[in-house]
Design a protein with these regions (language model features):
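Carbohydrate-associated surface elements
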Residues: 66, 85
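Short hydrophobic "strand-cap" motifs at the C-terminus of beta-strands
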Residues: 63, 82, 111-113
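Membrane-proximal helix-turn-helix segments that form the acceptor-binding/catalytic region
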Residues: 18-19, 41-60
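Conserved donor-binding/catalytic core segment of Leloir-type glycosyltransferases
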Residues: 102-119, 125
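A short beta-strand/loop micro-motif in the catalytic core of glycosyltransferases
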Residues: 2-3, 55-64, 80
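A short helix/loop element that forms part of the nucleotide-sugar donor recognition site in Leloir-type
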Residues: 91-103
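Short His-centered aromatic/hydrophobic patch
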Residues: 4-9
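A short, histidine- and acid-enriched strand-loop-helix "catalytic/donor-clamping" loop
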Residues: 10-11, 26-41, 56-59, 89
Length: 125
């Protein structure tokens, strides 16, 4: 069995099939639609990977319900929804953190995520 992560690498998921291997493709998101790839040759290649995953992968795993819906509506392809998981953090009293960093209530905004256009940080700032 071969497990391929992301749409770009999925372009090549037909190769293991030549050797009789089962292929699982995990799609982390619609990479071809990310702002940094839009309108580029890379976007077309990545989209080709998505189509090859649909055509050749024995199973497709997606990380969000929206992507699952997209694959069903666009390709009629059933997928397995397995969300990313995290360990629950230790709950601390907010006062411990605000006192430590000298923060006042309603005087700050916290953003956790990659600094990439699709996260929309420009709307937050």
């Amino acid at each position: 069995m071969v497990h391929i992560h992301a749409e770009g690498p999925a372009f090549f998921c037909w190769i293991p099939k030549l050797f009789g291997k089962r292929v699982i493709s995990t799609i982390h998101g619609l990479d071809w639609d990310r702002e940094k790839w839009r309108g580029s040759v890379a976007s077309k290649f990545i989209r080709g990977g998505e189509k090859n995953a649909v055509k050749y992968a024995d199973e497709i795993i997606v990380l969000s319900k929206d992507v699952q819906k997209y694959f069903l509506e666009t390709y009629g392809r059933e997928t397995h929804f397995i969300p990313n998981g995290v360990n629950r953090p230790e709950v601390r009293e907010a006062k411990l953190i605000t006192d430590h960093f000298g923060l006042e209530k309603d005087s700050y905004i916290l953003f956790l995520g990659r600094l990439v256009p699709e996260k929309g940080i420009r709307y937050l700032v």
